[in-house]
Amino acid sequence: MAAPAAVLGPSALGQSGPGSMAPWCSVSSGPSRYVLGMQELFRGHSKTREFPAHSAKVHSVAWSCDGRRLASGSFDKTASVFLLEKDRLVKENNYRGHGDSVDQLCWHPSNPDLFVTASGDKTIRIWDVRTTKCIATVNTKGENINICWSPDGQTIAVGNKDDVVTFIDAKTHRSKAEEQFKFEVNEISWNNDNNMFFLTNGNGCINILSYPELKPVQSINAHPSNCICIKFDPMGKYFATGSADALVSLWDVDELVCVRCFSRLDWPVRTLSFSHDGKMLASASEDHFIDIAEVETGDKLWEVQCESPTFTVAWHPKRPLLAFACDDKDGKYDSSREAGTVKLFGLPNDS
């Protein structure tokens, strides 16, 4: 049997105990049955289609919990919502009202009709797709850049450019708590159990707070440079972080140790998404491809080619379909064509 390969990259290499890197990583003995099966599927479903969504760059894409709708937020100050009809996205509505760029959005975890947008105009807005109206506008203290909805649906957390995270009651639309951090806050997320709140920061750390008390539980030295994004797997077994060192690290939720690294990207990892079964992890950056890895082995499962940097990816909650959006083309081609499009990978080749 081959000797275990060393895990390289994150700064806590070789330590043991919670919040550290596992000092070794198992070597896979060839592709798993799952990898072979998904590769076979993608060979027949490797088509990527573009759908016009906005008049400027798309910052964020997200699926409703039932997978019927995809929402996108853009530099053009609007959100768009599409219906998924078989093998295509059909634009349902455009949501206007923000006075600045829509930097991030997310859906209610269990109500497929509600989504929330975070904007540089110092507000968040909650929208209902049934009425196509904004049902609440909540004023915040700064320019908002990230947002997440708690798994129980009761709270929305929003982070701004001044590293303040505000917790807003999703029913009363009032602020419940506010935390000012002394470090650069990048992405924020609850764990699946709703009892801990995670932040990635500019020092390469993952900060964990108890929830709702918001008391510090642990700070994990995850990467030697800026820790940019974080996602929890739907099964509740792992979470993944992406960093400016171009590494994706996979962490055991209970032990808080790094179990695996993914190192196929060359540029800072901007966005991550787990597939609905928790078995695939998509990661993207300024590299002109999206890496799709098998979670349990780290093996490369597929590569989605792009013509420009990718800053948002989202797996469908029920099917192996990946929504994503890229940066505007850099003048090499007709720059107007790609600006504001949403893309869908995993469609049948003959569609």
From Swiss-Prot:
Keyword Transport tagged: yes
A GO term, aspect molecular function: RNA binding
Lineage: superkingdom: Eukaryota
Binding partners and assembly: Component of the THO subcomplex, which is composed of THOC1, THOC2, THOC3, THOC5, THOC6 and THOC7. The THO subcomplex interacts with DDX39B to form the THO-DDX39B complex which multimerizes into a 28-subunit tetrameric assembly. Component of the transcription/export (TREX) complex at least composed of ALYREF/THOC4, DDX39B, SARNP/CIP29, CHTOP and the THO subcomplex; in the complex interacts with THOC2. TREX seems to have a dynamic structure involving ATP-dependent remodeling.
Organism from which the protein derives: Mus musculus (Mouse)
Name of the featured protein: THO complex subunit 3
PROSITE patterns reported in the protein's UniProt record: WD_REPEATS_2 (PS50082), WD_REPEATS_REGION (PS50294)
Chain ranges passing through the membrane: none
